[in-house]
Amino acid sequence: PANIWIVYTQSLTEVLDYISRATNNEDFYEIDDDGNETDTVVLDGDGKPFRPDAIVVDGTSVLNLTTKQGIIEFSKKRANVKADIAGLIGDARLVKVDGAGLELKDYQTINFKGQDLILALNASGKHYIVTARETDEKEQRIIDGKKESVSTGRKIPEGFKGMQYNCKTCIRMYRDPDDYDTVKAFV
């Protein structure tokens, strides 16, 4: 028994379910080797049902990626329906379905899912930490008459767009370029 419980998942839906259980003081159940819940309640170090004081979501970048993958699969199904309605066959159908990608409305859905994650953590009453990889902030500029994406020189969390705006504190950790063993941080 311990006072830390680690759950491995790449599913945003599962993460939101665990946050909901923590918020509502519900029991957690041990996971078997196949990833299925058992009937065995997870216990803390005192033998009581486990109730987290803090939640760590390590990998919003991965959750964002898997969310996008799921929506792309849905987009292919959406394209399949459109191809059926249009009566497409052969290469035309193949291009329509296999070429399906994220549409503008899909990006908005993904961003809402990311905000749901942060807002669920805010409402949980638990301490929380959310990690993300970082990426260069980019802006659109017209260069030689063409619209191009240009780095601003700032680093931002890679993952759900705008998730940092609902967090109380953002810490950017980085290695000192002159001393790789030293980790520094911006708050």
What are these regions (language model features)?
Residues 112, 119-187:
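Phosphate-binding/switch region of NTP-binding enzymes
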Residues 1-112:
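Conserved inter-motif catalytic segment of the P-loop NTP-binding fold
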